[in-house]
């Protein structure tokens, strides 16, 4: 309720009407409810990834796997940052695009250096596939004027890489969380717990 009240107040003071704040863009414009369909599903992929990781990190059972808990938290937070960026078009409209992409690259390199063994043990192929697809999306985004195709075709390829990358990321997050539960169940079984 507090978030709702604060959001209303901030947006009203910024000049938005109640209708603009409360109603879906498709309702306001009279457009189809499927306007931005794949983009919206992409945001849901990021949100689901973050929720899976953070829930898994929060349920306990990490006596001997603190590094894995840290990895779940970092991957979960990165997923939510990607969701917010994608939903609000932060790197497209409000923040320097190259700086945002550089931050993502640096964070990914730090993850690889610090957690390489864990990532490869859990689901290295999914992590590298998702990362590769997302890197291709960024590459196409940064170089779209250099391709000898019209904007619509280049955008389709770029968004396709991003969407499939986000879906692969969700799969990786699922594997990361399930690995944590499998490992926890295995250790309970070895200790004779039920």
Q: Where are the predicted features?
A:
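Polytopic alpha-helical membrane-helix bundles and their juxtamembrane interface segments
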Residues: 1-193
């Amino acid at each position: 309720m507090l978030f709702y009240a604060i959001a209303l107040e901030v947006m009203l003071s910024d000049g938005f009407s109640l209708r603009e704040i409360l109603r879906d863009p498709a309702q306001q414009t009279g457009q189809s409810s499927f306007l931005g369909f794949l983009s919206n599903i992409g945001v849901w992929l990021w949100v689901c990834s973050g929720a899976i990781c953070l829930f898994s990190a929060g349920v306990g059972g990490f006596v001997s796997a603190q590094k894995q808990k840290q990895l779940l938290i970092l991957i979960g937070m990165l997923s939510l940052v990607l969701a917010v960026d994608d939903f609000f078009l932060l790197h497209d409209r409000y923040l320097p695009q190259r700086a945002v992409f550089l931050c993502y690259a640096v964070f990914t390199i730090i993850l690889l250096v610090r957690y390489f063994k864990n990532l490869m043990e859990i689901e290295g192929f999914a992590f590298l596939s998702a990362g590769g697809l997302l890197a291709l999306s960024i590459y196409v985004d940064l170089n779209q004027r250099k391709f000898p195709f019209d904007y619509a075709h280049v955008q389709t390829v770029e968004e396709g890489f991003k969407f499939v990358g986000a879906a692969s990321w969700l799969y990786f997050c699922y594997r990361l969380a399930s690995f944590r539960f499998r490992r926890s169940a295995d250790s309970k079984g070895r200790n004779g717990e039920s």
